[in-house]
Amino acid sequence: VRRLSLPDAVQRVLSAGGAALTEPPHRKARPTKSFSLPPRHADNRRVFSYLRGRGIDPEIINHCIKHGLLYESAQHHNCVFVGFAGDRPAYAMQRGTLQDKRFVGEVVGSDKRYSFAVPMTPGDSPTLCVFESAIDALSYLTLLKQRGRGWRKANTLSLGGVGKEDRQLPPALSRYLKACL
């Protein structure tokens, strides 16, 4: 899909076959819970150390912390990856930093349409790189930086996990495409 406009590339990918998007089975509506970010820890040392251990470049980690995209939670010292609706937080995915206990989960009330993205400004680049997780997106930015490419101009979008049963276009990708088309 190189050298195609974003709408043409999406159309080509969608027409290439694969599983058809279908209406999911009707689920009972759950009461909406309000979204609130977990309290912040005084520093981000454990998050920084954990992500460095995963090979993420320190400049990229600091960029995310500085812009409010990432911080360390106070209670469990999790990485908190934040997604924004305009200038307000609307989504957060937590990833545990402890090596002996694996933890991954969305913060209650998160709106998946606004999942973690760096920087996700459609006008900056004609390319959108889509990843399942925030750490995958940060790894990609690290690879761009290592190769001397413009990581600060790359549009990266994390889908915040993708379920096997969910055959709909992920909400964050759908929102992004509507903004670009």
Model regions and ranges:
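Short Cys/His-based metal-binding microdomains
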Residues: 1-7
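Small-residue helix-packing motif on alpha-helices
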Residues: 9-10, 61
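Basic, glycine-enriched DNA-binding surface that flanks or lies within the catalytic cores of DNA
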Residues: 15-113, 119-121
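C-terminal domain-closing interface element
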Residues: 51, 180-181
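Phosphate-handling DNA/RNA-contact segment within nucleic-acid enzymes
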Residues: 74-176
